[in-house]
């Protein structure tokens, strides 16, 4: 059953269609149009030909062609409290049979936070969604949403309300959200601010700043979602962005000066350790809230990957293979363990691909995929998956990884990739049950025991992979 979400915002109308009501279902349509809905609402007669109606008509046409059975439409600050909002709703209902739900500011903040949680499973900190008509703030921790606040600090409203001063904006954020956040979280305000762990930037205006930052620093990956920036580095960049008129980036002319003001104000008030950009926000939150409870509790990365490769959990025994590799990993954390699972799943994604090009294909896919991997996961997966198809890891990815992830992750990625190759050589492509075990001797040697004696050719391949694992561990020890 295909479902669609429409988000009517201050500056744009967005729509997305999902294949079904599972968390791992892929998007099969995603588009947006600029919207001057304020101009429409200011007309004497709302029943005129207008781009807003043409956009909605187009979406309805696409929904019909895709056999969409359920449409959820929400409108935010652009209609919230507007005297002609009800008249507009009635026209849209009559013309397109779409029911527009005009959500409150707090509801918008909640749904934005829910969307963030669906896309970043371990999100912790403050979600900030900046639109044309408002700024929504939400506290997030342990997949739960805490304090919610909607402030009249949208990029289009700041100038109209004469709020275009960093001190005014900072004071408003602190008074309306910061003080409540301090009381609720137990984090006491110091002279500088509150020191929240992460500040998640959502909304087109803030994402554009993130994209511009990536270009400015020549960030090697292209994925905006889950981009992590040190607070101090981001502060310095915002200063350059605000004052350096000669700065050359393709996004500079499109960045709203009020978005820079709001971003700087939030950094002043919350003092986050990191700034993280998220592509997941209101639309995703509306969908997430409509999903069954059991779907909401799942991990979107695992579910999206499972759907991609048509992974049958009853056929594979990933847990047992994970136990086999654990003794040879170097201080693995939960992310490292999750990489093992994802590599085994993605290693099945090789049908109808030239076997001599599988390594190139899978690396490029991981780097380009819209599955919401963290950048750390993308690099670890790329190294490990390249090794499952070739005897050497991808040179380009190796160079990136050495710059962007720590030595633990770099070495563990090599260990995982070579281990998966060993498992395939011994047990075949389906990881049903391990017929071998590994033991680390004196923290130097790796001993393998197999259920059956291996043919010489297979044994030699396994030994080469064990040597590669030993070399990765040796390099790590030398680095340390």
Regions found by a protein language model. Name each.
Residues 327-331, 399-480:
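Divalent metal-dependent phosphate-bond-processing catalytic cores, especially two-metal-ion Mg2+/Mn2+ enzymes
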Residues 82-89, 260, 463:
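Short, surface-exposed alpha-helical segments at coil->helix boundaries
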Residues 28, 146-148:
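A structural motif specific to WD40 beta-propellers
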Residues 73, 102, 277, 477-479:
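A structural preference for short, hydrophobic beta-strand core positions in alpha/beta folds
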Residues 7-12, 128-134, 202-205:
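A short acidic Gly-Thr/Ser loop motif
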Residues 1-4, 8-76, 85-99:
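N-terminal glycine/serine-rich phosphate-binding loop of ATP-dependent small-molecule kinases
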Residues 17, 38-62, 81-82, 99-118, ...:
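Helical "lid/coupling" subdomains associated with nucleotide-phosphate turnover
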């Amino acid at each position: 059953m295909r479902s669609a979400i429409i988000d009517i915002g201050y500056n744009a109308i967005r729509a997305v269609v999902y294949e079904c009501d599972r968390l791992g279902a892929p998007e099969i349509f995603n588009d947006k149009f600029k919207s001057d809905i304020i101009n429409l609402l200011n007309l004497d007669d709302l029943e005129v030909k207008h781009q807003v109606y043409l956009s909605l008509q187009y979406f309805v046409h696409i929904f019909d062609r895709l056999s969409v059975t359920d449409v959820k439409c929400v409108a935010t600050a652009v209609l919230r409290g507007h005297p002609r909002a009800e008249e507009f709703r009635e026209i849209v209902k009559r013309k397109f049979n779409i029911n527009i739900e005009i959500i409150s500011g707090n509801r918008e903040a909640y749904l934005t936070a829910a969307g963030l949680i669906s896309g970043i499973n371990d999100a912790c900190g403050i979600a900030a969604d900046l639109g044309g008509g408002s700024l929504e703030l939400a506290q997030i921790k342990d997949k739960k949403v805490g304090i919610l606040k909607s402030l009249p600090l949208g990029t289009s409203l700041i100038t109209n309300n004469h709020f275009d001063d960093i001190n005014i904006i900072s004071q408003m954020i602190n008074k309306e959200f910061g003080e409540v956040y301090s009381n609720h979280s137990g984090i006491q305000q110091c002279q500088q601010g509150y020191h929240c762990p992460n500040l998640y930037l959502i909304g087109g205006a803030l994402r554009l700043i993130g994209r511009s930052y990536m270009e400015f620093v020549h960030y090697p990956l292209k994925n905006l979602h889950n981009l992590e920036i040190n607070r101090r580095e981001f502060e310095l960049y915002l200063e350059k962005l605000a004052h350096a008129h000669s700065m050359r980036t393709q996004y500079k002319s499109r960045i709203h000066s009020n978005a820079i003001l709001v971003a700087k104000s939030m950094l002043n008030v919350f003092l986050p350790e990191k700034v993280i950009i998220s592509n997941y926000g209101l639309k995703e939150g509306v969908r997430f809230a409509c999903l069954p409870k059991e779907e909401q509790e799942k991990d979107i990365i695992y579910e999206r990957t499972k759907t991609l490769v048509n992974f049958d959990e009853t056929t594979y025994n990933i847990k047992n293979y994970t136990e086999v590799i654990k003794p040879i990993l170097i201080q693995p954390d939960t992310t490292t363990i999750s990489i093992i699972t994802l590599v085994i799943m993605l290693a099945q994604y090789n049908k109808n691909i030239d076997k001599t090009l599988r390594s190139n294909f899978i690396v490029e896919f991981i780097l380009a995929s819209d599955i919401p991997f963290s950048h750390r996961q993308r690099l670890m997966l790329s190294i490990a998956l390249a090794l499952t198809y070739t005897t050497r890891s991808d040179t380009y990815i190796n160079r990136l990884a050495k710059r962007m992830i720590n030595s633990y992750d770099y070495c563990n990625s090599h260990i995982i990739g070579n281990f998966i190759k060993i498992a395939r050589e011994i047990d075949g492509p389906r990881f049903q049950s391990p017929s071998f075990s590994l033991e680390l001797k004196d923290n130097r040697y790796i001993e393998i025991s197999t259920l059956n004696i291996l043919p010489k050719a297979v044994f030699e391949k396994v030994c080469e992979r064990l040597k590669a694992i030993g070399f990765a561990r040796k390099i790590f020890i030398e680095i340390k």
